[in-house]
């Protein structure tokens, strides 16, 4: 563990003694609830499983979500949320103490009865205490759950969704069947309906990703020529309309994949043309999604689309597409997984983990989730 991490852990354990875990006053029948998860897109999507479980238990409670600007699209139109609290830059990389205190002020103004902290940062764990929230339940990673009244230890290997749901179970609330969700708006569905070619099934490919505020992880990207071969086979062997998606900065990569696939009539480059809401609507209509470990991968799983995800430095047992009907393709060498808490082995130049996954490995996974 780096020296900085060790220092943070020791300081967190000392400060935790100032706020021992306890039993605050009973929750009201319809509590005011805040879910705190500032970043990032995939993690925020996974946290929607908590929203589903809370809403099922408290049908008329007020549930708000504190999220950063980068990840806001993941929950912007969620029907089970009353409103969103803007975290600004807090939780998305570098931010000032003034910004952190301003977020505490916003949380205090909500007069919440309960806050679920789905973040490993001690700064996030401390926020609801500073804001005067009596019930504070959240993750306690290496003793960093400062000021939480109920601490859920991060121990062993567990999928991130199940870890978040453990915070709900710490309240005595059942979580069976809860999963991440995304609800495209009617306007997004209508626009996408007019963009999809008729007469063929739709397959979506996302060859980019690995980017979050303050982090770019190119090792998560499966090579473009292999995505091109998958696109070609989907168009020719499965007679699918293949749509390549990504952000505005991914258009060149998407065009490379389309060109290498042979620039077939049924392979389309839509990178940079869709909002997150519209991407969800497109994925909702797709027969299959193929992509890297990205927010788009979690979005595909959240709308119920059979998902094939290619993994390298990160661990699909923790971050893979959640639920039945999906496949994560991972052939880890002895050094994998090296991605941990937003960091990876930057000295790695060979990317053996992602290179080990062959076209045939991915094609077999596609055949499993989308039988011919």
List each model region and its residues.
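Catalytic machinery of carbohydrate-active enzymes
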Residues: 1-372
């Amino acid at each position: 563990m780096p020296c900085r991490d060790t220092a943070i852990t020791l300081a967190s354990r000392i400060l935790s003694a100032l706020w021992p875990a306890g039993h605050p006053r009973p929750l009201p029948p319809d509590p005011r609830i805040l879910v705190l998860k500032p970043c990032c897109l995939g993690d925020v999507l996974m946290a929607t499983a908590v929203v589903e479980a809370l809403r099922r238990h408290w049908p008329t409670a007020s549930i708000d979500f504190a999220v950063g600007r980068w990840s806001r699209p993941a929950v912007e139109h969620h029907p089970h949320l009353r409103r969103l609290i803007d975290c600004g830059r807090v939780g998305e990389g570098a931010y000032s103490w003034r910004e952190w205190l301003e977020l505490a002020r916003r949380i205090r103004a909500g007069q919440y009865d309960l806050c679920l902290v789905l973040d490993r940062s001690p700064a996030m764990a401390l926020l609801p205490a500073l804001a005067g929230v009596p019930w504070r339940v959240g993750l306690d990673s290496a003793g960093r759950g400062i000021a939480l009244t109920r601490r859920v230890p991060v121990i062993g290997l567990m999928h991130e969704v199940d870890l978040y749901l453990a915070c709900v179970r710490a309240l005595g609330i059942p979580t069976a069947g809860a999963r991440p969700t995304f609800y495209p708006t009617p306007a997004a569905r209508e626009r996408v309906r007019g963009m999809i070619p008729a007469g063929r099934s739709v397959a979506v490919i996302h060859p980019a990703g690995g980017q979050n505020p303050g982090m770019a992880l190119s090792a998560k990207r499966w090579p473009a020529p292999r995505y091109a071969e998958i696109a070609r086979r989907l168009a020719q062997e499965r007679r699918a309309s293949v749509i390549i998606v990504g952000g505005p900065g991914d258009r060149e990569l998407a065009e490379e994949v389309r060109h290498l696939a042979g620039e077939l009539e049924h392979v389309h480059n839509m990178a940079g043309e869709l909002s997150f809401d519209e991407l969800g609507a497109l994925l909702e209509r797709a027969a299959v999604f193929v992509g890297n470990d990205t927010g788009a991968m979690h979005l595909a799983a959240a709308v119920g689309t059979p998902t094939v995800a290619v993994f390298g430095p990160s661990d699909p047992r923790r971050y893979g597409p959640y639920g039945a009907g999906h496949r994560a393709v991972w052939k880890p060498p002895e050094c994998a997984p090296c991605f941990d808490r937003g960091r990876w082995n930057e000295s790695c130049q060979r990317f053996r983990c992602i290179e080990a996954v062959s076209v045939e490995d991915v094609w077999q996974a596609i055949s499993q989730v989308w039988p011919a």
